[in-house]
């Protein structure tokens, strides 16, 4: 009897495969090696992402204007002949400005790829925090149907929230908006 009990305990599935890890399971050491992203770190990364996108937009805008200017500078144009009824220099100036605006709009795509490359280690946690933050905004956001000129809705998408202090102020502004919209209806 005793030997049967020992054998049954030795040859159980758990005892046989306790040293093995299956592909469907994960180890606890991989999750413990990466520290969790705090809200303060998330807001710092969000601010860094916005700054990189803005700087990239400025540089690509200047680059787009320069490329448009260099292209239009090589075209031979009769200065006295109007283009679609407008002065040619005005059309060329408008084209340079349009090239700069298109370059500025391309900038955030380049900036976001730069941000992803520089913060590759924290990117997954940043995106998880970002979805959690946006879901919190969606829950706490007031109904915009009652906005007016005297009572505008506060930062609907939360684009100006870069710290916990800003988030708390946004919540206060949302509560003030709700209170004003209920009182004056």
Swiss-Prot record:
<comment type="subunit">
    <text>Component of the PAM complex, at least composed of mtHsp70 (SSC1), MGE1, TIM44, PAM16, PAM17 and PAM18.</text>
</comment>
<keyword id="KW-0999">Mitochondrion inner membrane</keyword>
<feature type="transmembrane region" description="Helical">
    <location>
        <begin position="90"/>
        <end position="110"/>
    </location>
</feature>
<keyword id="KW-0496">Mitochondrion</keyword>
<dbReference type="GO" id="GO:0001405">
    <property type="term" value="C:PAM complex, Tim23 associated import motor"/>
</dbReference>
<keyword id="KW-0809">Transit peptide</keyword>
<protein>
    <recommendedName>
        <fullName>Presequence translocated-associated motor subunit PAM17, mitochondrial</fullName>
    </recommendedName>
</protein>
<keyword id="KW-1133">Transmembrane helix</keyword>
<keyword id="KW-0472">Membrane</keyword>
<feature type="transmembrane region" description="Helical">
    <location>
        <begin position="55"/>
        <end position="75"/>
    </location>
</feature>
<dbReference type="GO" id="GO:0030150">
    <property type="term" value="P:protein import into mitochondrial matrix"/>
</dbReference>
<dbReference type="InterPro" id="IPR013875">
    <property type="entry name" value="Pam17"/>
</dbReference>
<comment type="similarity">
    <text>Belongs to the PAM17 family.</text>
</comment>
<keyword id="KW-0813">Transport</keyword>
<feature type="transit peptide" description="Mitochondrion">
    <location>
        <begin position="1"/>
        <end position="52"/>
    </location>
</feature>
<dbReference type="GO" id="GO:0005886">
    <property type="term" value="C:plasma membrane"/>
</dbReference>
<keyword id="KW-0812">Transmembrane</keyword>
<comment type="function">
    <text>Component of the PAM complex, a complex required for the translocation of transit peptide-containing proteins from the inner membrane into the mitochondrial matrix in an ATP-dependent manner.</text>
</comment>
<keyword id="KW-0811">Translocation</keyword>
<dbReference type="Pfam" id="PF08566">
    <property type="entry name" value="Pam17"/>
</dbReference>
<keyword id="KW-0653">Protein transport</keyword>
